[in-house]
């Protein structure tokens, strides 16, 4: 048994499916939305999430999740963070122990405050779990734009195996043994990207964006180290790299949602306008509660929480951030 199955037919999963099909892998996509599956099989494109790319004929879309789960050695969980536990429960009865589970979502489980790999391992405890993360917008991956990411696992032999599967001439994959740092960086950067987008929407300039990104990185490091991550991980691809691309790219849905909020929309209105999951919203709620319980300073996250969930005024929150007591830049 070989090949790669994607549980979820969103933009990033579809982009990776295209890339792997070009490499010669047999690829299967399952999604609960049958219109997506029909488009893939008949039009050879994902009209909803990645409409400008042709999907190779060796990619099959199926509506039978049992068939999809049994088809391949590598099972990629390509669904939003809130759906991870649900899809694990759907496929757990169909898996064999030699199948490797690959998580590509970025976030935390809101109710339990657990990292997504922890959630996967709880449900699929017989299977090895690998996390793939990094600065990798779907629109660029699908078009073979040079991209670098990281794979990590609690057992690095599985990360190295997945590294071999996903490596191409345009998609370079590094290994990193710090699974905690990799996942925390990928989750918290969405919070900072939302804040950065709000600054853009208000009309602030490059100075503000630079401040949000660098001070945001301090918040990522503080909470990440507190949760067990290594400081150096946050200066790598899944920390600084992912933060840069998410805060600056025209493809970033978190930044785009932030822009709309900065221009006067409510959080709900902005998310509805984007039409896809904005992971930074749930992440902000999760990490606001985490930093409160752990006693970690995260002022940008706190201000964003007030804007998203307490109808705070974005400009007032920026003023409050700027008016805080003076500090050393490197307080930890």
From Swiss-Prot:
Enzymatic reactions: sn-glycerol 3-phosphate + NAD(+) = dihydroxyacetone phosphate + NADH + H(+); sn-glycerol 3-phosphate + NADP(+) = dihydroxyacetone phosphate + NADPH + H(+)
Cellular component GO terms held in the UniProt record: cytosol
GO BP terms: carbohydrate metabolic process; glycerol-3-phosphate biosynthetic process; glycerol-3-phosphate catabolic process; glycerophospholipid metabolic process; phospholipid biosynthetic process
Keyword terms, alphabetized: Cytoplasm, Lipid biosynthesis, Lipid metabolism, NAD, NADP, Nucleotide-binding, Oxidoreductase, Phospholipid biosynthesis, Phospholipid metabolism
Enzyme Commission code: 1.1.1.94
This protein's pathway: Membrane lipid metabolism; glycerophospholipid metabolism
Subcellular location(s) per record: Cytoplasm
Binding-site list for NADPH: 11-12, 32, 106, 138, 253, 277, 279
Catalytic residues, chain numbering: 189 (proton acceptor)
Keyword field contains Isomerase: no
Family named by the database record: Belongs to the NAD-dependent glycerol-3-phosphate dehydrogenase family.
Name of the featured protein: Glycerol-3-phosphate dehydrogenase [NAD(P)+]
Organism expressing this protein natively: Clostridium acetobutylicum (strain ATCC 824 / DSM 792 / JCM 1419 / IAM 19013 / LMG 5710 / NBRC 13948 / NRRL B-527 / VKM B-1787 / 2291 / W)
């Amino acid at each position: 048994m070989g090949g790669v199955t994607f549980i979820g037919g969103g933009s990033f999963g579809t982009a990776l499916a295209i890339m792997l099909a070009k490499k010669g892998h047999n690829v299967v996509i399952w999604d609960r939305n049958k219109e997506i599956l029909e488009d893939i099989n008949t039009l050879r494109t994902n009209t909803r999430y990645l409409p400008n790319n042709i999907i190779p004929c060796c990619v099959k879309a199926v509506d039978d999740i049992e068939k999809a789960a049994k088809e391949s050695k590598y099972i990629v969980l390509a669904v939003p963070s809130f759906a991870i536990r649900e899809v694990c429960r759907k496929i757990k009865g169909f898996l064999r122990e030699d199948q490797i589970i690959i998580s590509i979502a970025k976030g935390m489980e809101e109710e339990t405050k657990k990292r997504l790999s922890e959630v996967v391992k709880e449900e699929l405890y017989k299977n090895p779990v690998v996390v793939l993360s990094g600065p990798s917008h779907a629109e660029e991956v699908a078009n073979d734009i040079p991209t670098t990411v990281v794979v990590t696992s609690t057992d690095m032999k599985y990360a190295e195996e997945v590294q071999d599967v996903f490596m191409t001439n345009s998609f370079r994959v590094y290994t990193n043994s710090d699974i905690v740092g990799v996942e925390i960086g990928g989750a918290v950067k969405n919070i900072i990207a939302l804040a950065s987008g709000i600054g853009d929407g208000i009309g602030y300039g490059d100075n503000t964006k630079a401040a949000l990104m660098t001070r945001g990185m301090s918040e990522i490091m503080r909470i990440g180290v507190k949760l067990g991550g290594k400081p150096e991980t946050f200066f790598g691809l899944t920390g600084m790299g992912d933060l840069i691309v998410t805060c600056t790219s025209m493809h970033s849905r978190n930044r785009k949602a932030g822009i709309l909020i900065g221009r006067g929309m409510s959080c709900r209105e902005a998310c509805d306008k984007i039409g896809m999951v904005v992971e930074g919203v749930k992440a902000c709620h999760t990490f606001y509660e985490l930093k409160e319980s752990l006693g970690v300073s995260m002022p940008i996250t706190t201000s964003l929480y007030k804007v998203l969930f307490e109808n705070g005024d974005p400009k007032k929150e920026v003023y409050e951030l700027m008016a805080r007591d003076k500090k050393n830049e490197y307080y930890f």
